[in-house]
Regions:
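C-terminal beta-strand-loop-alpha-helix "lid" module of Rossmann-like NAD(P)-dependent dehydrogenases
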Residues: 1-291
Length: 291
């Protein structure tokens, strides 16, 4: 019965693993709901900032704000790469990195230099392993990321755009569609598109006027920063919701696979036990017949 003992050991090992994956599935389900709530709560703020910024930009065309000025030629491109800090979330990070690296390769073939800001340890490790120029990073962001952790890296890359050290900035992350679907997304963060500097109604001007202190330009310059930060935070929240959804699905699949493995091992154990009993009975009968 040495074989039977080995099978029992494997069954217990798989059962222990199943308990872990089941617990991780339940934790991911709870965290996913919280990240979805955070996404919904962050959206109204970003929309209101965009609305006020649009009004100020349209009524102050000669604002002279560098973050709103497009660069004529792209010689250097920057990326804000958003990935998770932890694994066990299926192909989530792999899909984001695939989209990111495809664009990086395209730029490199055109002779365009690339610089990267990494939010998340998985993206940072991938960029370092292939020798990309990482100018700033933020890792170990936790389940509830704080804007204070993002300000340093974001300020670094935005200042490079203002100084014309970067001509375009992309943001790459995983967009949360639903529990079963998360899609890699790449957006141009800078220069800010004309669709952003619009009131969203198709009209090119606003009928309402406000007085801004200390001046409309000063307020606009402040809001542009806040808008960009809110867009990145929204993308980070999307990515975290995608991470928890992907992990929940992956852990459910692992739990189901563990259950199937336990059934198969139990079947093998019962067959080996039955064969051992049959052999013993045959030996007893043969011994009795010999007597």
């Amino acid at each position: 019965m040495a074989v039977g003992k080995e099978i029992l050991t494997k069954i217990r090992s798989v059962q222990n693993t199943q308990k872990i994956t089941k617990a991780m599935q339940m934790v991911s389900t709870s965290k996913m709901r919280k990240t979805q709530d955070r996404m919904r709560l962050a959206r109204p703020y970003a929309e209101k900032v965009r609305t006020v910024m649009s009004h100020l930009a349209q009524t102050n065309a000669d604002h002279g704000i560098k973050l709103l000025e497009p660069h004529r030629e792209v010689r250097r491109a920057g990326f804000i790469l958003i990935t998770s800090d932890k694994g066990l979330c299926g192909g989530l990070n792999a899909n984001v990195l695939k989209k990111f690296l495809a664009q990086v390769q395209e730029y490199q073939e055109q002779g365009i230099e690339v610089e990267v800001v990494c939010l998340g340890s998985k993206g940072l490790a991938a960029c370092q392993s292939i020798g990309l120029n990482v100018i700033a990073s933020a890792t170990n962001l936790g389940d509830t990321p704080k804007m204070e952790l993002l300000l340093g890296p974001l300020t670094e890359i935005f200042q490079r755009y203002e100084k014309h050290e970067l001509d375009r900035i992309h943001m790459v992350y995983s967009r949360f569609v639903n529990t079963m679907r998360q899609e890699p997304r790449m957006e141009v963060l800078l220069p800010i598109g004309e669709n952003v500097i619009d009131d969203g109604t198709g009209h090119s001007s606003f009928t309402w006027e406000y007085l801004y202190e200390p001046s409309p330009i000063a307020v606009l310059e402040y809001l542009v920063r806040r808008y960009l930060e809110s867009v990145v935070y929204q993308a980070l929240s999307d990515n975290m919701a995608s991470e928890q959804a992907a992990r929940m699905v992956a852990m459910k699949a692992a739990t189901d696979n563990a259950g199937n493995a336990i059934k198969e091992l139990c079947l093998v154990y019962n067959k080996s036990r039955q064969a051992a009993i049959t052999t013993e009975l045959s030996e007893i009968v043969a011994g009795a017949a010999a007597v």
